[in-house]
């Protein structure tokens, strides 16, 4: 399958979808989670965290699915690490971390 799906390729945009755990309802996914600037960061090959260029979106609207889009610049690494940490207090959703190993 061609970009932006699998396999994740170095220097090519990449899209993946996740569901976040609802912090107030253990064992449940959070429907329509609130996503704010600064919640989502990316690290390339251990070089340091930066905000994602494109804020993740709930897609389809009102669902549990969060669409994460990484640009070709953000995918310019052998190891890409994405983290999501809700900055609100109390937290709405549980922290998230994902490592992506790219191919050439």
Model-found features: residue ranges?
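Polar, enzyme-active/binding microenvironments
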Residues: 1-104
